[in-house]
Amino acid sequence: MDIADEASTTQAIALHRPWAIVNASGYVRIDEAETEIDRCHRENVLGPEVLAAACARSGLPLVVYSSDMVFDGRRDTPYTETHETGPLNVYGRSKADAEAHVLARHRDVLVVRTSSFFGPWDETNFVARLLRALGEGRAFHAASDVTVSPTYVPHLVDASLDLLIDGEKGIWHLTNEQALTWSVFAEIAADRARLQTGLVNACLHDDLPWTAPRPVYSALKSERSRVMPGLDRALDQYFRERDVA
């Protein structure tokens, strides 16, 4: 199914007859988006817009995911759902545009802004890369001047489905609601794993191989309701699930 193709989307809905659709697809490579602008736009803007229009025609609720990258980072307290967007990079602009387009196309859409994923089932997220490096005795570089809100993926899934079932609409911020720098997050996770926190190299974001500009503060908080557990509980569950996986 190509969600950027109207015929493909309409055919899939007719075939599977879902009661709702959750769109977890999209272009996620923030740095590469600076040069893959057309692909980023197609996957992050055109696709969700076409899908939203198809869901509106079929009367289906829709969940789409957005990002903390829609903000400019000029605040020093967490962004809520009503703060003005001001993306700094191509990826962030694609997410801000997608929000506007899907909300214009469909009145029964839930837009979930989230941030800084980690989960037990992949080895590419921040925490997994940290643990791998430290476990091999290698230093791990993490920004000490960029503040985010880490999000445990299983909690995000549970909260998204709860809101969908409850018929919630509009923009929601879903994270584990703790604002901290990448380097502090790395030290906390390393300590939980009983690895050497001294191998965490706190550095400035300018010293990292990032090509796309990023907000230095993009922590999120919901002014609608708190529906996700805190970060301590998220890390507890992460390490339990990781041991099982």
What are the language-model segments listed below?
Residues 31-38, 73-77, 123:
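Conserved catalytic-core motifs of eukaryotic protein kinase domains, centered on the activation segment
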Residues 100-148, 155:
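NAD(P)-dependent short-chain dehydrogenase/reductase
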Residues 198, 213-245:
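C-terminal amphipathic/interface module of NAD(P)-dependent oxidoreductases
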Residues 3-43:
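NAD(P)H-binding glycine-rich loop region in Rossmannoid oxidoreductase-like domains
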